[in-house]
Amino acid sequence: MGTIEDVVEFLRFNGVIKGNTVSYNGIIHYAESVSIILGLSPEESIKQLLSYLNKNGYVVVG
């Protein structure tokens, strides 16, 4: 089971995160992969990821 930081690195590698900007559509596209990394349901994974991003100054855009 991975961490939120692992997910952020995965999303950065796949171009979903650029600088401090995050593509919401990209998060949804990779929701299944994110859930596998975290070992949670896709819904819970996305909820935790968005909370982490918000707390750490990332800007989520459509």
Curated annotation (Swiss-Prot):
Superkingdom of this protein's organism:
Viruses
| Name of the featured protein | Uncharacterized protein 69
